[in-house]
Each structure stands twice: as C-alpha cells, then as structure tokens.
Design a protein with these regions (language model features):
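Bacterial Sec-dependent N-terminal signal peptides
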Residues: 1-27
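Cleft-lining beta-strand/loop regions that shape enzyme active-site pockets
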Residues: 19-30, 34, 38-51, 74, ...
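An acidic helix/loop motif centered on a single conserved Asp/Glu
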Residues: 49, 53-67
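PDZ/PDZ-like peptide-tail recognition elements
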Residues: 57, 69-107
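Structural motif
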Residues: 122-124
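Polar, glycine-rich mid-to-C-terminal structural blocks
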Residues: 287, 299, 306, 310-377
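Conserved functional hotspot residues or short segments at active or partner-binding sites
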Residues: 340-341, 345-523
C-alpha cells in the first residue's frame, strides 16, 4: 500500500531539476532508488524521453522478473482482455465475418438491437452513419469503433441485401450485448449431454446452470464437459461450476500464498449424480484446471484427452490510476489431493516457458502417453478411490487420447492461414442461403443428408493454386479434402443455425469426444 501511494504522489510532484533529485538521493530505500532513476532519466537524459513508455517498460521489467504470468496491460489492452470475461459489451449485436473488404452478417444476436431493427443473416453492412466502410480498405478496428458505442446511442447502418437493388437503411439503438462463455450445448446421444465452455467469465455459472437444465429436460443422465482450449478466467466461476458436481463440503480447491483459503462444495449442485467426463487438451489452463482437478481428485468423473497446460498461479488484478492494470501472482492453487499443477519455470526466462508446447511436441508427449514422465516426489492419490495422480506440470488425464496429426496437413494449414476455406464457405452460404433453408428445414435433415458440392471444393483448390498453395502429393490432397468436406459442412451448419450445430457435426469425427462416448456407453 505504501509503495502505491508513493508512486501516485510522485506523479504529482513538480519536476524541479537538481534540488529535488539531491533531496531524494539522501533517502536510501529501494523505492526511492527507482524514483530517483526515473527522475534523472526524464530530466537529464540527452534526448527527449517518452516518460509514459519508460514507466511502462519499467513495470513490465519488474513483473517479468517474478513469474511467467504476472503482467502489465495498458488501458487499451485491459478493455480487450476483459471483454470476453465480463459477459457483455455495448454495440449493435451481430456475429460477422469480413469477406472481400465487406462486413457480412452471419447471425444477428437473438433479441439484440440489430435483430430488433430488422437486420438479417446474409446482410452486408456497407456504411455507418453515411460513411462507407465497404470497399475502402478500412481496418477492422476502425469499423468496430464506428459500430460500437454506449448503450442507448443510435447508429444508422447502410445494408446491401440479396433481392434488393438499393441500399437499405436501418437505425439501430445500441445496447448491452452478451458475450457467451458456453459455446455449445446439445445432446450427443440419447441420455448423453455435451457442454463446451470457452472460458470462465462473469456469466459462466449462470450460463452453465441454464445449459444443465436444458439438457436435463431432454433426458440427460451423463454429461461430457468439454474444456479443450479453455484458457481459464475467473477462479470464482470455476469454483461455482465445480460445485455443481460435488457433494457438500467436498474440497474444490485451496490457495496458499500469504494466506491460505479453502473453497468447498455447498451441496446444492444440480449434477451431483450421473456419469461425468471432462475433456481436456494441452491448452486447458488455469480456472479450467481447477474444475478438472476437483473432478479427478474427488473421483467424481473421468478426465479424457491430453495433459493440460499447467498454470497453477492465482493472479489479482490491480487497476492503476490511468486504468491500466497489473496482474500480480498472489498465491498458488492446489487441487483437493494437494497437487500444485503449475509447470516448472525459471524466473526471468519467459522464452523457455513459452517453448513448452513445442518441447512437448518434440518429445512426443502429444502422441504417446509413455513419453510423459513424472518424478515420484510428485505422486498423489485421489481422495475416494486412491488412484495415482501427479502434480507439478498440468493434469494428466485418466484416459489419454493422442493428438491426431493426420487431420491438419501442411496443405490445409496453408489454406486456412489465407482464409481460403472460410471465404469459400461464406460465399457458398451467401449465394445459396434461401435454397439451403428451403431444402433443409431442420438440422437433423441437414446433418443426415447434406454434402458440400464438388464445385465448392474445386474452387478452393483453384484459389489455393492462385496463391501458390499446393499439396505435396495425392495422399496429402485426399486427406485434406476429406477433412475439409466435414469442416465446410460444419461451417454451413453454423451459419444457418449456430455453434451447437457446428460442434454437433465436428464432434462426430473428434477422437476425444468419441472416446468419451465409448467410456459412457461401456460404463
């Protein structure tokens, strides 16, 4: 507290060269040393100094010497970081993609301001308040700046719609737009529900309860909880979700720093009975690992997939006077069995820490469980069935599913990187939306009988050749195109219905999801 006050007071001091520095030099404290150095550089350095940048770099340097996750964010970065976790932002409410320098509406947010104003899927937004935004090479950031704004303010949108020659005008009143952290909820099989959580934000628990209730009404007895690629978020949200699975007073997680805190289940969870499988991969981190660790250590369910990221540090967000922020590690968290799952790091060597995923791939850990080794000192036991588990570097799943390296070929990655596949899908849906909705009035019919036309695939290949993107051989081409047909079918389903339908198609070929279904089916 004293240090933050000193920093704030220093910002208010007059910059009197000489006397002030001489006075401060007589005070021998680490904080005063830092202040003196900044004052000397700012007032005496031969060239003009950007003081704001100087201070920010000093803060980054201090935090970088602590651990890999203590960090500094400017006020602009703070807004971008917090938006997915806060649960809402203020704007017009559309899901969109950019195609050929034009904003194409994929879906208006249900009950959002754009839907209420009459904007439809497939519309192209070509102007905002009379200013053209299509065909003028305006940056995505600038377009978003024009579309977003405080709740209650109005914006006039120029729309190009198929079947109309003239530009249509819509007046939209901006409002709070929910940012969903649950990206899919549907029934995988009769009696088996599926929920995918993208991150743990302010509204995650509320969304999760609604998803549970929806699936339970559809007859769910078993649940597959997908935390793949979930990078974490708010610890409280993770604790609240874990509470839904556990019995009263079951330990969920505890933190240990300058103080120790325990978080236990309240006994009011909505899915305390029933088969539970948690899906994880190498990008499952932080808050997502709290849920995973609680389920595994309490023997509440099985963990399926690959070893998780290994982030066992708790950060506190501290807002600075200019609304920039530091995230400071204040504790380690531990799973119920006492495991700290933070992977090893050396202070000040963030580059080595960042190479962990490449090192796992190089060692074969993503393809073979036998390539993963834990020291005996990191051995722990689950609390009910006393199964062996390990700490010190992520959570090892109960059932390992290797990374399918045959899906993502070099050819496919190159096409994806240049947005060839995405743009082909957008053009196809845009040109055929009416015909598709008439031919496939229900998703079940679409899933059962729709196939991507060969002409779409041929166009992707031709577009790739124009960009000098070619397969190495016939085998790579066949493998890529087979997977691309599935991917495109899922993308069309997303554009016509939503993300539930997208995952309902993609998961039919997911090795991890299919492994989970097999475990539930075979008890």
């Amino acid at each position: 507290m004293k240090k933050s006050v000193l920093i704030y007071l220093f910002a208010l001091l007059p910059f009197t060269v000489g006397a002030q520095i001489k006075l401060n030099l007589n005070r021998n404290t680490p904080m005063q040393k830092l202040i003196n150095a900044e004052m000397a550089i700012n007032q005496l350095y031969v060239d003009t100094v950007d003081e704001k940048r100087l201070v920010e770099e000093a803060i980054r340097g201090m935090l970088g010497s602590l651990d890999p996750h203590s960090s500094y964010a400017t006020k602009e970065e703070v807004k971008a970081l917090q938006e997915p976790l806060n649960g809402n932002f203020e704007g017009i409410g559309v899901e969109y993609n950019m195609i050929e320098d034009t904003l194409l509406v994929i879906q208006p947010v249900v009950d959002g301001p754009s839907e209420k104003a009459g904007i439809m899927a497939g519309d192209r937004i070509v102007s905002v308040d009379g200013t053209p935004i299509a065909g003028v090479h305006m940056s995505k950031e600038e377009i978003m700046r024009r579309l977003r704004g405080p709740k209650g303010t109005k914006v006039r949108l120029g729309i190009r719609r198929q079947g109309f020659d003239e530009e249509l005008q819509f007046r939209v009143t901006r409002d709070k737009i929910p940012v969903k952290s649950i990206t899919a909820t549907y029934m995988l099989r009769p009696g088996v529900g599926y929920i995918r959580i993208g991150n743990f934000g302010a509204t995650t628990h509320e969304e999760f309860v609604k998803s549970l209730q929806k699936l339970q009404k559809l007859g769910m007895k078993s649940l597959v909880l997908d935390l793949q690629e979930n990078g974490g978020g708010y610890m409280k949200a993770a604790v609240d979700v874990a509470n839904e699975f556990l019995q009263r007073l079951d330990l969920i997680v505890y933190t240990d720093g300058r103080e120790r805190s325990e978080f236990r289940a309240k006994g009011n969870g909505r899915f305390r009975v029933g088969s539970l499988i948690v899906l994880v991969d190498e990008y499952t981190a932080s808050a997502a690992e709290i849920v995973t660790g609680a389920v595994q250590d309490q023997d509440r369910g099985l963990v399926v997939g690959r070893r998780t990221f290994g982030k066992g540090l708790v950060q506190r967000q501290i807002t600075l006077p200019d609304t920039s922020m530091i995230r400071l590690t204040i504790a380690h968290y531990y799973t119920p069995a006492g495991r700290c799952i933070q992977k090893p790091y050396v202070k000040g060597k963030s580059e080595d820490y960042a190479m962990d995923m490449q090192n796992r791939l190089r060692r074969g850990e993503l393809m073979n469980a036998d390539s993963i080794h834990f020291a005996d000192s990191l051995r722990y036991y689950t609390l009910r069935q006393h199964r062996t588990v390990y700490g010190g570097g992520g959570i090892m799943p109960d059932y390992f599913v290797p990374l399918d390296t045959t899906i993502y070929t070099r050819y496919h990655r190159a096409l994806q990187a240049r947005s060839v596949v995405l743009n082909a899908n957008l053009r196809y849906v845009d040109d055929n939306r009416r015909e598709l909705t008439e031919a496939y009035p229900t998703f079940d019919l679409f899933k059962q009988s729709f196939e991507i036309p060969k002409s779409v695939i041929d166009n992707i290949v031709e577009e790739g050749e124009k960009l000098d993107i070619k397969p190495q051989d016939k085998a790579e081409k066949k493998k890529t195109l087979d997977y691309m047909k599935l991917q495109l079918k899922a993308l069309v389903a997303r554009d016509l219905w939503g993300m539930d339908e997208y995952f309902a198609i993609m998961n039919e070929s997911s090795p991890i999801v299919q492994a989970a279904i097999g475990l539930i089916t075979n008890n």
